[in-house]
Each structure stands twice: as structure tokens, then as C-alpha cells.
Amino acid sequence: MDASLSPDQLSFPAVWRHPHLLDLERLTAAEILAVLRTADQLKTMTEGCRRKVPLLTGKTCANLFFENSTRTRNSFSLAAKRLGADTVEFSSSGSSVAKGETFVDTAKTIEAMGVDWVVTRHSTPGTPHLLARELDCCVLNAGDGPHEHPTQGLLDMLTILQHRIGSDWKNEAADPEKVFAGMTVALVGDIAHSRTARSNLWGLRKLGAHVIICGPPTLVSHRWEELGFEVAHRLDEIVHRCDVLNLLRIQFERQKARPFPSVYEYAALYAMNGERLRLAKDDILIMAPGPINRGVEITPEVADGPHSVILEQVTNGIAVRMASLWLLANAKENADASAENLS
């Protein structure tokens, strides 16, 4: 991508018509690739000295987070600001939610202040879909319980593309369903409680990757086999086949009972360490959505080693969220204009 690319050269993809980003399961391969191409362009535009491009000046993004977040919340805020938009930061503690106000009423109150996007994270699956029905502004899912985390799935795929797939995927003639053809990606760890896993599973498969789901039987349902995914219960048996390992943390906060005898036993079977790295391909990519638990799903030598792209995932998160905000805003403006012309 030409580093001199300017904002007026950014073209809106005709395939994108969604005013909301709620999940990847219901997006097509072409729509997913459109977001990734836009993110790649915006990343280039905002690198180096030019940190901001005024594509969304005058608009406002509200972050309504009802669960803790470091990467996602700050990333959405930076994404909005780099495109010239303002942000509203909401925290459930100290708000009227503590007085009994409902989730939807809170969102409607924030919308009434004139916001253009609501970015929401909530422990209950489906809450972003509910808001999309209740609000007039754009809604982005920043994680709804164990259901999905679409921008995390997108940033993970963007990172893989930039490291493993040359530049052919940027060509409009590329077949979206074959972008990851021939590539094997393993998601390792707590699949049962991971919204990141679900977004990755749908997105990677739509773009042609072979996906392996690996983890303890208590955390990996055989339902995934019925849906056509490969399931494994021993990392040692698959690591040599993988082009990418995405290591998911154990989400103890979502579990009612411990799914294995001890953290030590889990690490012995599933942690990516130096010994397992020597069994892997020379160019394997090591990923993790964060936060990482050193010594549990990954050892420090691997997390900080040359195969790790964990911090690059964080960087790409800003690009993906810039693309998401821009695409949704334009799609809504186009839809509103069409509706006005018909009236």
C-alpha cells in the first residue's frame, strides 16, 4: 500500500451496507474482506507523522462498557479520535444503572445526547442486537458475554493477512472465500467461554482457512465437530501442522466449576512453551487476544519471542475499529439518504 495514500482516495466498498457490526457469523466473506481492506488502508494513512485523518469530524462515539476492558475500550476511543470524532466514555459504576435504570434506557439516554455510534460490551449474549433494534444510531458489539467479539476476530485476521498472505488479498479480483486457502489456524484454550473464539471461527472459515479447535474436553464441545470444525484435545498432536496458534486465556470469571484439576496441569498440556515451539513450523505465528496469563497459556519466552505478534494485534485493533466506525457511518448515511429520497 502506497504510504502517500490520502483520505480522499479511500473508496467506500459497495458490498458493505450494514449500519451495525454485531457479529461475524452473519457476514459474508466479501463483507469481512471489505472491512480488512479498509482497515489496512487506514492503518497506512495514520502511520508516521500523520496520526489523524478527518474522515469523521463532527461525529461522536459513545463507549458503553458494562464489563472490564483495557485494549478494546481504549482502542475504540483512539480509533474515533484518529478519524476526528469525539468520544463519550460511560462506566456502569457511578451511573444511573446503579439506581436501577435499565440497559436499554441508559443507551437511549446516551443516544439522545446526539451520538452517532454506541460501542457496547455486556455480559449477556445478544445485548448489541437488542440495542440495534432499539436505537437509531450505529451499534458495534465490543463483546457480548461468550457469544462474539467481531472486531477482535477481524484484527486477528488482519494480522495473519499482513504476515502470511502477501498482497494478493488487497486486489479486488481476489476470491474472498479463498484468501486463507491452504492455511491451518488453531484456537487453543477456553473455547467454551470465549467470544473471541467464535468470531475467529466464523471469520477464518468464511475466508477459507482450516480451523482446529484445541483444548480440554470440558472446554471444547463436540458441537463444533458437527459444524465442520476439527477438534483436538492435545496440543502436541497438532502443533506441527499449524501456521498460526491463537492462545485463549482460561476465563475463570465465567466458570461455575473449575474445568481441570489445576492450572499447572493445564499448562503442562496446553501452554505454548519453548519445547512445543521447537515442534512447530519455523514461521509459525503466535497470537493471543489478551490479556495473557504468563505461565498458563503461554510462557514468557514465547510471548516475547520472534514468533509472537501479540502487540501487533493491539496495533491492528485500532485500524480495524477505525474501519468499522467509518464503514458503519457511511452505510447509515447512505441508507438514510435512500429512505429520504423514497419518502
Curated annotation (Swiss-Prot):
Q: Which NCBIfam families match?
A: asp_carb_tr, PRK00856.1
Name of this chain's protein = Aspartate carbamoyltransferase catalytic subunit
Its gene is: pyrB
Task: Give the pathway annotation.
Answer: Pyrimidine metabolism; UMP biosynthesis via de novo pathway; (S)-dihydroorotate from bicarbonate: step 2/3
| One Pfam family cited in the UniProt record for this chain | OTCace_N
- Catalytic activity field: carbamoyl phosphate + L-aspartate = N-carbamoyl-L-aspartate + phosphate + H(+)
Q: Does the keyword Methyltransferase apply?
A: no
Function as written in the Swiss-Prot or TrEMBL entry: Catalyzes the condensation of carbamoyl phosphate and aspartate to form carbamoyl aspartate and inorganic phosphate, the committed step in the de novo pyrimidine nucleotide biosynthesis pathway.
* Oligomeric and partner information: Heterododecamer (2C3:3R2) of six catalytic PyrB chains organized as two trimers (C3), and six regulatory PyrI chains organized as three dimers (R2).
Q: What is its EC number?
A: 2.1.3.2
Q: Which GO terms describe its biological process?
A: 'de novo' pyrimidine nucleobase biosynthetic process; 'de novo' UMP biosynthetic process; amino acid metabolic process
For this protein, the record's HAMAP family field holds: Asp_carb_tr
Gene3D superfamilies named in the record: Aspartate/ornithine carbamoyltransferase (3.40.50.1370)
The family database entries (SUPFAM superfamilies) matched by this protein are listed as:
Aspartate/ornithine carbamoyltransferase
